[in-house]
């Protein structure tokens, strides 16, 4: 008999809930976590300004009425420290720590056909066997550093945003470089600009950003939030991407120019992702419609940035608004009006190397005390590539996915029996915690089904994998976001072999995804090979 009924890799948001649900069913379960405590993304990403881009109250767990009553978010978009406190509160409340082994990085997982079990190997060489293997390793958890010579030569301090130290970093009077202007770069830049002596931002690709409009939650609003939780979570189940916002049913050209401008102005002044997820229905599929919102936001950037040359560098020219995941900001553009902030366009003057004193571009040597790498993640498949997963006959998952992931429902892979993925490739993302809860509940239902019937082997069929993968690819056709180089299309210039676009995510609606998964469960999982 295996050591465990289920092993979970990871103790972030998905791992914690999966542990809770399986333990609730009475199964023998263990979670292995590389960090020293729970939190996942919110444990590692401690960089200045890290916070939600989903409303706090729509991001937290919905499974416990008592938890919803007890916990009070202080802001509409909570910062990393508060979010980490929340996840620790959850772990303490449901006594989850006792079944999590920390400082335990999983390096390999090998399936044995004879015993129909997985052997999981940790970095320290320890091994554990399990009937079911559940990956809760997150789509954005493997940081990448730029392929620039000389990184090790720098004599100052350097940090990646996703591996920020627990101790606070003193920026007072320091000469600081930030490489990267994605979501983490934007949050970091706008937060430290008022603290540093001088800030130099190295930008390769500008991103469209929109105001976050965060604020404190007062007692009256807190009471309304708590009273409205059932309605709010029901709404999240109905919306396209599980956010509070849903697309406007009108097309961008079904209204007058004046109405369209007023609508964009209204969205620009509202909290959160409304301008992205609550916009006209065609802005992400029709180039002309997209051009109207892109032009509107470009005009806003020009209004907010005083130096016209700098403003133009901050306006994307190679992709339309919303075709990449949208960073939300708080006075980000105004940062570039400060005398102590400089923007370097590395498409014009590329970085040649890191020097002991700082950064050398094609036209200048810069000296710094601190370099911050806001260079993102090897997204979606990167966390799987870091672990040596081997299925039937020693098949390597990394080899199987070399030309792009192939999955069944984004949860299972042919030749990898009893391996179940949470938030893996080809699954619904959006407001991730809402998708996490559904995926965990579905996986729990499948394991319960198997255990009750003494089934020891569950495997996706080649036909099922092909059908789902083809379906996911078809859904992506016509979406402007799939014509753009970004982490959502598998592009990462800092990772060898990831310079070709792939279909890495499910582009359909979350309700449609759940309906398909529910259909499979309702039919007794007969699309799987059960044994």
Label the model's feature ranges.
Residues 1-6, 11-152, 167-168, 181, ...:
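N-terminal FAD-binding dinucleotide-binding subdomain shared by FAD-dependent oxidases/monooxygenases
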Residues 174-179:
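The substrate-binding groove and active-site-proximal loops of carbohydrate-active enzymes
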Residues 163:
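Flexible, glycine/small-residue-enriched loop-and-beta-strand segment within the central core
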